Amino acid sequence: MTRAPGVLIGVDVGCTTLSGGLVTPDGNVLSAMQAPTSLGAGTAVPTILGIVADLHAEAQARGLALEAVGIGVPGLVDAERGMLLHSAGSQVADLHRVPLAELVSAKTGVPAFVDNDVNALALGEWMFGLGRRAASCVVLAIGSALGAGIILDGRLVRGKSGFAGEFGHVPIDFGGPPCPCGGRGCLSLYVGGEYIAAEARQRISREPSSLLALAGGEAGAITAETVFAAAAAGDPLARSMVDRACRALGAGLAITVNGLNPEVVVVTGGVVKSLLPLQGEIIRRAGEYALADSLAGTPIHFVPGHKSQTVRGGAALVLYERARRGAGLPR
């Protein structure tokens, strides 16, 4: 009897959108679907299980054998137990301390793995994307905040407590504003979309700006994208914020290449679309802080985030964990 071709399910739990897809072991996304993450208290787990069940049914209808499920979630994850321990996003608070991998495995009858979403994203870029064939690869993901996924010498770096990659909470301004993490002047405060938008909404009440008009007169409608568009049109307030974001991200890249010396760096996420015209300025700023030889020898790619990329990350997590656990390697 011929065995059905194998397929994986990759899931990315974002703070606003949950994405899932069927992915072949070589990274080809066969189909994908999305659902809002913010559906109300108690809905995160049923929404995830529902998308997984729908994808499992689709795999069966296609004559494909589901092999495993990989899920990326935002926050601190216990990868061995397959659960989210803590996240700053209230949208996923329902997942805290929930044995998600166990629940998904019980639903599907196949192994399930859970890790930090940026770790999964980094594994996807390393296996299927711009980090292919590199022994070391760092992914900086810039969405509402900034996080990093680190592959060094072919191993995902999680750190002793799972906090490795929290580059968004590296202080770059010791006298800067307070961060929700308890620190001050953290990198995320200057480049994260949520923080850029919040600061702009706050400052328009006391500084002249076209931002309110661009947002249709609604301060709450101002987003990071609004700020970048206003800066491109010459708005002084927006330009000052975008210039600072370029300097801050340049410093973040310098920290990355000086501290880790990776073969390749990928900057991705929802904010990156707005950063594309500013790549040259960001790299120039990085050159002001980085060791020249380290920066010159490291390709830095800017890639806007997209659904297939995050879904592949979940599939890559499966492949990585199966290989790691099969070899008996520590996490």
Identify the meaning behind each predicted range.
Residues 2-50, 83-86, 162, 329:
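Short glycine-rich, Thr/Ser-proximal phosphate-binding strand/loop in the N-terminal lobe
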Residues 8-12, 66-70, 113, 137-141, ...:
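Short glycine-aspartate micro-motif
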Residues 112-118, 172-207:
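Glycine-rich phosphate-binding loop plus the immediately following alpha-helix
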Residues 134-190:
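Glycine-rich phosphate-binding loop of actin/hexokinase-like ATP-binding domains
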